[in-house]
């Protein structure tokens, strides 16, 4: 089964770092002519003295290069999500800057420009962050009755849910081991952790699940689990299989011999046992019929009873001879 390959952040650095300052993108901006990206402040400062791309030397604009620069929010969100602590550190630097320079007018800027956006509002999750989750047993019958009213739920169903606080780097494999040890589930049963009705991979982390299913922190991360028997694999003994194949071949050979003997009375030469020589029906004229390789053949001598046709066979091929 195909598995997602995890790569190191250092392998992605060439796509996440600005060539002008050597750091990760902050307020990423892209040149629409060549699609190369830089930090906004870096490219604006560079284009004050040049009208060409720093990477490929394509002309950005003849007179006003800033017109062909666009803010790349998607790229910036990717950088913030891939680099741990970058968003939180950048927001802190902006707050410190405006606190140290109160004369700077930031009223026209957004909350992110002023550094007043929290990780929760930006939906940025770090590895060391604590995530609240709920885990409950997945009942297929209850899922089929999903259209019923909420008031029909019993107190037992509400008490089935448990709440945990776990690091964002916790994997589903660790959560399955926790459930097995907590509930004493035997090893011959399989535990599946699910989001809604979809089973989750063992290598998924809570951070992966939050990003994949767009968890918005409006409550604990809802997870479910189910327990099912482990499927046993039947092992085939190669020695037994070889014996069965050999016996099948022998049966097919014997069947072909029987079919040959019934189809027209032609003696078969494929049998492993030699057939006895066929004696001449005329003991006084032994030259009429002779045996070659267990089959009958006619002699070249003249037969006194030539007026009667006889049937002979040579090497399993029948023929009618008139003598």
Swiss-Prot record:
- Which keywords does this chain's UniProt record carry? Chromatin regulator, Metal-binding, Nucleus, Repressor, Transcription, Transcription regulation, Zinc, Zinc-finger
Transcription among keywords: yes
Q: Where is this motif: Nuclear localization signal?
A: 81-95
Per the record, the zinc finger regions (RING-type) lie at 18-57
Which PROSITE patterns would you find in this protein's record?
ZF_RING_1, ZF_RING_2
Coiled-coil region(s): none
A single Gene Ontology CC annotation of this entry is: PcG protein complex
Composition-biased stretches, type Low complexity, lie in: 287-301
Give GO BP annotations, semicolon-separated. Answer: negative regulation of gene expression, epigenetic; negative regulation of transcription by RNA polymerase II
Q: Which PANTHER family match?
A: POLYCOMB COMPLEX PROTEIN BMI-1, RING FINGER DOMAIN-CONTAINING, POLYCOMB GROUP COMPONENT
Q: What is this protein called?
A: Polycomb complex protein BMI-1-B
Organism lineage: Eukaryota, Metazoa, Chordata, Craniata, Vertebrata
């Amino acid at each position: 089964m195909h598995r997602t390959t995890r790569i190191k952040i250092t392998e992605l650095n060439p796509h996440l770092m600005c060539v002008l300052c050597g750091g990760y993108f902050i307020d990423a901006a892209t040149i629409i002519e060549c699609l190369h990206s830089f930090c906004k402040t870096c490219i604006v400062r560079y284009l004050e003295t040049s009208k060409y791309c720093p990477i490929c030397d394509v002309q950005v604009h003849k007179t006003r290069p800033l017109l062909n620069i666009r803010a790349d929010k998607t790229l910036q969100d990717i950088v913030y999500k891939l680099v741990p602590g970058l968003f939180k550190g950048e927001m802190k630097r902006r707050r410190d800057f405006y606190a140290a320079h109160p004369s700077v007018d930031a009223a026209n800027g957004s909350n992110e420009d002023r550094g007043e956006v929290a990780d929760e509002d930006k939906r940025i999750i770090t590895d060391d962050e604590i995530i609240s989750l709920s885990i409950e047993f997945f009942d297929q019958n209850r899922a089929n009755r999903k259209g019923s009213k909420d008031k029909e739920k019993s107190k037992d169903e509400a008490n089935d849910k448990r709440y945990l606080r776990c690091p964002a780097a916790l994997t589903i494999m660790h959560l399955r081991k926790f459930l097995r040890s907590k509930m004493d589930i035997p090893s011959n049963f399989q535990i599946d952790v699910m989001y809604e009705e979809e089973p989750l991979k063992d290598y998924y982390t809570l951070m992966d699940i939050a990003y994949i299913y767009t968890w918005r922190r409006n409550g604990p991360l809802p997870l479910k689990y189910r327990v099912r028997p482990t499927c046993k694999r039947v092992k085939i003994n190669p020695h037994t299989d070889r014996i069965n194949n050999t016996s099948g071949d022998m049966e097919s050979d014997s069947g072909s011999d029987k079919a040959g003997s019934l189809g027209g009375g032609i003696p078969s030469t494929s049998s492993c046992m030699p057939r006895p020589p066929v004696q001449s029906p005329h003991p006084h004229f032994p030259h009429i019929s002779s045996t070659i390789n267990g089959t009958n053949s006619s002699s070249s001598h003249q037969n006194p009873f030539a007026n009667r046709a006889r049937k002979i066979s040579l090497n399993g091929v029948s023929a009618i001879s008139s003598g």
